[in-house]
Amino acid sequence: GLFDVVKGVLKGAGKNVAGSLLEQLKCKLSGGC
């Protein structure tokens, strides 16, 4: 239903945010920013 679609979108957005934060962290740790 509609709830499942919304949940899926939110999960995807959360993954994207977490992924970009991890990338920034890796970049800072390796000093390659």
Swiss-Prot record:
Subcellular location: Secreted
Family label: Belongs to the frog skin active peptide (FSAP) family. Brevinin subfamily.
Protein known as: Brevinin-2DYb
Tissue: Expressed by the skin glands.
Pfam families tied to this protein: Antimicrobial_2 (PF08023)
Assigned keywords, A-Z: Amphibian defense peptide, Antibiotic, Antimicrobial, Disulfide bond, Secreted
Protein's GO biological process: defense response to bacterium
InterPro entries attached to this UniProt entry: Antimicrobial_frog_2
Signal peptide start-end: none
Organism from which the protein derives: Rana dybowskii (Dybovsky's frog)
Cysteines engaged in disulfide bonds, as pairs: 27-33
Superkingdom per UniProt: Eukaryota
GO cellular component, one term: extracellular region
Function text: Antimicrobial peptide. Active against the Gram-positive bacterium S.aureus (MIC=30 uM) and the Gram-negative bacterium E.coli (MIC=30 uM).
Major location category of this protein: secreted
